[in-house]
Design a protein with these regions (language model features):
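Divalent metal-cofactor coordination and adjacent catalytic microenvironments
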Residues: 1-172
Length: 172
């Protein structure tokens, strides 16, 4: 239970989840004619469709050469990461109409494998949650300086370990 709670706390703090949900279909509103921000995609095997006329009928299926997954090579600052953006290339453009979700993506969402630092952060936070049972009302004990309190927030070491994976969402 502590491990599951720690894992969900890390997911919430980073704005992403570090497991694969399998293949699913999701809908997005393009940021502009060239870029669509998407949830974490762990595989290049996907189906991308758009509604060219804006009527919600996804009648245009894009070929692999019509788009580019980013970050390129699934790597940022030496860290292996999933794809989070799709860039239109060649002859296609994303439809942009009043922030409507006119992009349909069928893909494997999530992460292919859990990064080592996320696993370590989960272990640290889980042990903290487990030890929380020994600190009723957040008081871990009394020392020379008075009561020692246990924070209800993420452990500072955990925050540092997960910081490179934090994602701020700015898309629909």
């Amino acid at each position: 239970m502590a491990v599951e709670s720690a894992s969900r706390a890390i997911d919430g703090h980073t704005g992403r989840y570090f497991y694969s949900t399998g293949t699913a279909t999701r809908y997005y509103a393009a940021q502009d004619s060239f870029i669509t921000q998407v949830d974490d995609v762990s595989s290049t095997a996907l189906t991308l469709q758009t509604s060219a006329s804006g009527d919600g009928i996804f009648d245009t299926t894009w070929a692999v050469g019509d788009y580019q997954l980013e970050p390129l090579n699934g790597n940022v600052d030496g860290l292996a990461v999933p794809y989070t953006r799709i860039r239109a290339v060649e002859n296609y453009l994303f439809p942009v109409e009043d922030e409507q979700a006119l992009v349909k993506l069928t893909a494997v969402f999530g992460w292919a494998s859990v990064p080592i630092s996320i696993t370590q952060a989960c272990i640290i936070q889980a042990s903290r949650i487990f030890k929380r049972l020994d600190s009723p009302l957040g008081i871990a004990g009394f020392g020379d300086m008075g009561a020692m309190r246990v924070s209800r927030y993420l452990d500072p070491d955990v925050e540092q370990l997960v910081a490179p994976y934090r994602r701020l969402r700015d898309f629909v």
